[in-house]
Amino acid sequence: MTDNNTALKKAGLKVTLPRLKILEVLQEPDNHHVSAEDLYKRLIDMGEEIGLATVYRVLNQFDDAGIVTRHNFEGGKSVFELTQQHHHDHLICLDCGKVIEFSDDSIEARQREIAAKHGIRLTNHSLYLYGHCAEGDCREDEHAHEGK
């Protein structure tokens, strides 16, 4: 918990119980790409009395402070993940919503080449690749929203 206290203070945020609990849930392996609603449900399951409006407010504060990264994958629902030191891209299944993170040096190099060719110096980018799971009908997969 001390590390979370330090992280909040370093981000310029006051240490509060809702912020600590939300940060704790975001650090769980099963909550790598989580919506505000799913995070709220997890807090309820933990016996925490933190309202949905508070969850949204804290996630927006975390996004502004750089603690989380907001993604707007296909379907319009925002999902959040803890901001990571290493850059990665995402593969998203349009059927089940599964999100797979990947890194590929050749893709990164090609993006820099294209930007340079057009006179742009990249400072940031996001790559989302959408498709369908090769395993067939994955819509019933109960683990569909786990980040891998």
Curated annotation (Swiss-Prot):
Can be UMPylated on His-118 by SelO/YdiU. GO terms for biological process: negative regulation of DNA-templated transcription; negative regulation of siderophore biosynthetic process; positive regulation of DNA-templated transcription. Its main location: cytoplasm. It comes from the Bacteria. UMPylation of Fur by SelO/YdiU splits the Fur dimers into monomers. Fur loses its DNA binding activity and therefore its repressor activity, which induces the expression of genes involved in iron uptake. Zn(2+) binds at residues 33, 81, 90, 93, 96, 101. Residues 2-84 are annotated as: DNA-binding. Coiled coil: none annotated. Keywords: Cytoplasm, DNA-binding, Iron, Metal-binding, Nucleotide-binding, Phosphoprotein, Repressor, Transcription, Transcription regulation, Zinc. Residues 85-148 are annotated as: Dimerization. The modification N(tele)-UMP-histidine is found at residue 118. One of its GO terms (cellular component) is protein-DNA complex. CDD domains: Fur_like (cd07153). The keyword Calcium does not apply. One of its GO terms (molecular function) is DNA-binding transcription repressor activity. Gene3D superfamilies: 3.30.1490.190, Winged helix-like DNA-binding domain superfamily/Winged helix DNA-binding domain (1.10.10.10). Homodimer. Activated by cadmium, cobalt, copper, and manganese ions, but not zinc ions. Belongs to the Fur family. Acts as a global negative controlling element, employing Fe(2+) as a cofactor to bind the operator of the repressed genes. Regulates the expression of several outer-membrane proteins including the iron transport operon. This is Ferric uptake regulation protein.
